[in-house]
């Protein structure tokens, strides 16, 4: 328990590399502790070469024990962090000290290298396991969404650099636990929350430095993906770059008659008018460009297919007939039938050439339309020479590449995100605050200010009002102050500013229905080069229809490893001569049947070699529905198929419980768990944690007892075994025949017989009878995606008294249902919020279920809208 000193102070001790403590460090000075969000912490301090022992100055025994690569245990802010000593500097001066320099314990990964690692289609758990294999660090918690994504890696670096590449690739936030030697991976919005803390000159702030760097602003971003792909085909302007001049346009505003209401701080009115006019043109005609490009791409695909067929007709089939005619003539055989075959084949060749010519003509026409549209959407032509020169002053150009993205649609969407993060000067604020962790009156803030938290900084003199991530903390324990760095945030905007900003940029192109690409070039490995000339179609795999094709194993952290098996003949026939199988997987909270290709951005792909008949997806969420598909493939030469591959159909399981497959209705956790549940740390171990954080829940697996650490002590929140009743321990002396019968888990499972009159010193009348104890209220919640049907029924395990349905979309309203006769929706009136409805069109309650709206408005069940529901039963 770290309650012997104030959280704002620091305790240090020295340990060997196995963490065995060998000395407390009582005499130290000039401590500098730098904490960094999503990176390594560092620590430095001085210790004297001599120390006072019983009023005598003697050589400091700690200085003698100090070694590089030993460990330092630091206790501060009710936390424990381990550091590795990376340097010692001995100074023979007036003070005679040793400066000790340390890095966070994960620094040891810098000393171990990965050479030529290649991982294809790996989720975060798989690639992180490869990275940490054989090291002291293990994987802790992984947000389930990261195991539903797959990325490929080609790395030669230190293990720490590799680990950093992993979390950056998956856009995860690493959290190192140097006590348990683990690294966990969270979504940023999970660890970065605004807890209502504000720094200002009136509150905590000593001084402040707010840096605005225009060099960091980007208004034009050139975007490329894997193998140089660009966004022209999905960008409404048809360009390979994105523009956003909103920072320099603000606060320009005009009415519908083009009268200027507010001038821009930077741009002339003529230029502002021209940019807004251009945006309106792009919003109006940009979709036409996308449609034309899709038509051209489809025609080019058709052309390639027909050219392949022409090659087969002309260079293979016709040539075979001509060879037969030559042989027949030399042998003096009749060639009449062969000549008929030749003439018929020549007619096929002529027809195929005519078809290709027609497609070429269509491609030419569409190309001309595209060029005309490009000309109309050319910003340079639209602005003219004079305005183009004015705009050039505000074009801050940069390049952005993401080699993990091979699909134009995903690249376009990620490019928009990147530009939105760089279209204004980044937040870079450094401020010194008082060390409030030493002030008992500020105790309420102790667990609300730490790395990753979002802090609001307000300074009226600087006109600063910003919410940003607390990315760094430097403690000066001698001066009782903390230097805080805040970054990666946005300057506060009013609603008027937010609305104005939507006018300054073109609308995002709708990409919801775009077919996304599969990275076949990376996924499909040529395991068998001897079949590259086989042009025969590939046979379909088969999946047993008896419910045994899919199985799963529950991991200690509650995730599951799901395996699917299939069948495919081992045969030398061409149709069975393949390179491998591509496993498709889609997960959802809905039990609806899924067709592959519907939401390709949410699909996972895994490639296995031709000799395998089973594949396993690791670290998946246990209470989701999984749809699997198996596809056989053969990689071939381009002359056989221009795509370089021949694919079978995607075969899905047909057994009802396997299409889709639900591993479990809930998340089952066993063994040792370290992770967040509803914002709290949950740990399930036989031994009670020694240095818990506030809010830690400990579950004793022996008796299922739960205890919550409130920052000072453990509080029992529930008990699996009956050790007491209403706080009184059962008395066996006053009531001789009181015999509790427990099962192997420690839970009372038998009845208590005899004539006992007392229990825990209380008479029977002091205790309530079961029939007099009120039944506790029931509650359930869940998520579903609307399918557009009327009166959709959602089953429950109890009959509800009240149901709330909240859409995660502005396309629908929240429903409040408290009757079998109908529900209500909120409406905004001049006096505030009120309810409207009262009929079945707004949903209804039922026995062990609730029902969504019954009319054509489909309230509570609009197509593709996601809903969160809550059901209550009051007793």
From Swiss-Prot:
This is SPbeta prophage-derived uncharacterized protein YomG. Residues 351-381 form a coiled coil. Residues 537-648 form the Fibronectin type-III domain. The lineage of its organism: Bacteria, Bacillati, Bacillota, Bacilli, Bacillales. It comes from Bacillus subtilis (strain 168). It holds the Pfam family YOMG_N. The keyword Coiled coil applies. Keywords: Coiled coil. InterPro entries: DUF7359, DUF7360, DUF7361. The gene is yomG. It comes from the Bacteria.
């Amino acid at each position: 328990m770290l309650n012997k000193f104030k959280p704002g102070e620091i305790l240090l001790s020295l340990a060997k590399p196995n963490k065995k403590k060998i000395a407390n460090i009582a005499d130290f000075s000039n401590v500098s502790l730098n904490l960094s969000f999503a990176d390594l912490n560092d620590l430095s301090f001085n210790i004297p070469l001599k120390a006072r022992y019983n009023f005598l100055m003697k050589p400091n025994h700690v200085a003698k024990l100090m070694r590089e690569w030993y460990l330092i245990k630091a206790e501060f802010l009710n936390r424990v962090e381990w550091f590795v000593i990376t340097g010692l500097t001995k100074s023979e001066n007036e003070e005679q000290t040793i400066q000790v320099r340390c890095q966070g314990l994960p620094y040891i990964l810098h000393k171990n290298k990965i050479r030529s690692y290649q991982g294809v289609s790996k989720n975060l758990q798989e690639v992180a396991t490869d990275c940490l294999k054989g090291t002291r660090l293990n994987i802790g918690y992984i947000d389930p969404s990261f195991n539903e994504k797959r990325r490929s890696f080609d790395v030669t670096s230190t293990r720490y650099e590799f680990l950093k590449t992993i979390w950056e690739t998956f856009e995860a936030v690493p959290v190192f636990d140097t006590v348990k030697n683990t690294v966990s991976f969270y979504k940023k919005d999970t660890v970065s929350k605004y807890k209502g803390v504000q720094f200002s000159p009136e509150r905590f702030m000593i001084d402040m430095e707010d840096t605005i760097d225009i060099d960091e602003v980007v208004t034009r971003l050139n975007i490329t993906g894997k193998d140089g792909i660009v966004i022209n085909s999905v960008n409404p302007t048809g360009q390979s770059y994105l523009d956003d001049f909103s920072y320099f346009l603000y606060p320009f505003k005009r009415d519908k008659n083009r009268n200027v209401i507010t001038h821009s701080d930077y741009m002339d009115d003529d230029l502002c008018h021209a940019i807004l006019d251009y945006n309106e043109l792009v919003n109006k005609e940009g979709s036409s460009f996308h449609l034309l490009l899709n038509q051209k791409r489809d025609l080019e695909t058709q052309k390639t297919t027909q050219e392949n067929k022409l090659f087969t007709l002309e260079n293979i089939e016709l040539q075979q007939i001509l060879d037969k005619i030559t042989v027949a003539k030399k042998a003096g055989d009749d060639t009449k039938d062969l000549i008929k075959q030749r003439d018929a084949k020549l007619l096929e060749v002529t027809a195929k050439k005519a078809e290709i010519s027609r497609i070429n003509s269509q491609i030419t026409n569409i190309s001309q339309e595209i060029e005309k549209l490009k000309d109309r959407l050319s910003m340079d032509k639209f602005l003219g020479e004079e305005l183009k020169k004015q705009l050039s002053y505000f074009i801050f150009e940069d390049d952005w590449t993401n080699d993990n993205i091979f699909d134009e649609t995903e690249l376009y969407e990620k490019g928009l995100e990147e530009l939105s993060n760089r279209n204004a000067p980044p937040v870079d604020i450094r401020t010194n605050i008082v060390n409030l962790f030493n002030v008992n009156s500020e105790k309420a803030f102790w667990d609300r200010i730490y790395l990753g938290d979002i802090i609001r900084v307000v300074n009226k003199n600087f006109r600063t009002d910003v919410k940003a991530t607390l990315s760094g903390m430097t403690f000066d324990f001698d001066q009782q102050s903390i230097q805080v760095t805040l970054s990666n945030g946005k300057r506060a905007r009013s609603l008027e500013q937010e609305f104005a900003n939507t006018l300054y940029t073109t609308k995002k192109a709708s990409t919801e229905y775009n077919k996304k690409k599969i990275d076949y070039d990376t996924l499909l490995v040529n395991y068998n080069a001897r079949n590259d000339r086989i042009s025969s179609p590939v046979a379909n795999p088969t999946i047993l229809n008896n419910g045994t094709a899919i199985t799963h194993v529950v991991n200690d952290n509650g995730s599951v490893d799901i395996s699917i098996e299939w069948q495919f003949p081992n045969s030398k026939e061409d149709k069975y001569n393949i390179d491998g199988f591509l496993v498709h997987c889609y997960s959802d909270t809905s039990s609806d049947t899924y067709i592959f290709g519907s939401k390709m951005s949410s699909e996972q792909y895994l490639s296995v070699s031709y000799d395998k008949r089973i594949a396993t997806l690791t670290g998946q969420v246990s209470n989701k529905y999984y749809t699997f598909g198996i596809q056989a493939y053969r990689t071939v030469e381009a002359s056989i198929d221009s795509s370089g591959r021949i694919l079978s159909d995607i075969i899905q399981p047909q057994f009802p419980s396997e299409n889709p497959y639900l591993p479990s209705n809930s998340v089952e956790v066993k063994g040792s768990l370290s992770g967040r549940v509803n914002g709290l740390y949950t740990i399930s171990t036989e031994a009670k944690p020694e240095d818990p954080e506030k809010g830690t829940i400990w579950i004793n697996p022996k008796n299922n007892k739960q205890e919550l650490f409130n920052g000072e002590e453990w509080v029992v929140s529930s008990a699996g075994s009956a050790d007491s009743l209403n706080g009184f321990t059962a008395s066996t002396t006053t009531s001789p025949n009181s015999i509790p019968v427990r099962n192997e888990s420690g839970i009372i499972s038998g009845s208590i017989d005899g004539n006992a009159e007392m229990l825990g010193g209380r008479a029977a009348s002091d205790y309530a009878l079961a029939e007099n104890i009120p039944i506790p209220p029931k509650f359930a919640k869940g998520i579903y995606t609307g399918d557009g049907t009327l009166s959709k029924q959602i089953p429950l395990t109890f009959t509800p008294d009240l149901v709330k349905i909240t859409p995660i979309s502005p396309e629908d309203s929240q429903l409040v249902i408290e009757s079998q006769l109908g529900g209500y929706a909120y409406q905004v009136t001049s006096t505030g919020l009120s309810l409207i409805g009262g009929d079945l069109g707004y949903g209804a309650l039922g026995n062990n279920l609730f029902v969504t709206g019954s009319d054509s408005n489909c309230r509570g069940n609009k197509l593709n809208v996601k809903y969160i529901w809550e059901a209550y039963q009051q007793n």
